[in-house]
Amino acid sequence: GDQMTHRFSSYESDKSKALKVDASYGFKLQKTSATKVTVTKGTKCAAPSKFNGEDLELLAFMKKYTWFKTSKNTANNIQIKISDLTVYQCNSDGSNGHWVKVDLVRTITAIEKYKNQDGYIALGLGITDAVYIGIEEMTVNNVFYKAGTSQKVTLKSNVTLTDIDTRQYIGVSASKIDGQYVSNNTTLSYLKNGNKNFYYADNDINYSGEAKTAVGFIFED
């Protein structure tokens, strides 16, 4: 049988506090030996080492993302397909556990530039793995398909977004968001606008990834 570990996805602070969810939301996407990334829209480029004459110190995992220049690629024309991912799904009590193989299609659907300045956008394997340089903001759309088909599938999972500080914000929408969680000393403000949930850091402090700057979601999508 499949020996892959059932990996819970949560944010753990130095006090070992974490997001706790029922079993049906407890697992996240994982790579398999067959996982590969294909550019389905746009022209990719190498991860940049400089921007506007300044050296960039990208983290090693960011360099592995798929990078695009906004000067050569526009919104709705940047897309990657991540083939052969897998996620463990089960009922709330842990019964009926099984692995689901999926393809994930990630599309940049909006780009807001800063003073018409071009920059870079990068996408990774996970639904929150994204980086931008030199632009104001962007919107990423994630769609799951049954592996090797064009049949959309709905999955239950959870995600935690960390290090939202220094006037940053994040907006999240899904087919169904079943829970949202922050720490009891959160520094974030909240706004719901239509089907999007926004969390905003209304301060100039860099908290370096503390739990108070994190928000967790359980969702179906």
Give residue spans per PLM region:
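A general structural signal for short secondary-structure junctions and capping/turn motifs
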Residues: 71, 150-152, 217
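Extended extracellular/luminal ectodomain segments enriched in beta-structured repeat modules
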Residues: 75-77, 148-158
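Residues within well-ordered beta-strands of beta-sheet-rich folds
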Residues: 141-143, 156-162
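Contiguous ligand/interfacial binding patches
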Residues: 6-9, 13, 17-21, 25-29, ...
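A mature extracytoplasmic/lumenal domain signature
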Residues: 84, 144, 163-165
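Short beta-strands within extracellular/lumenal beta-sheet-rich domains
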Residues: 132-149, 211-215
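Extended, low-complexity, turn-rich repeat/linker tracts enriched in Gly/Pro/Ser/Thr and Asp/Glu
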Residues: 90, 132, 149-150, 162-173
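N-terminal targeting leaders for non-cytosolic proteins
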Residues: 1-130
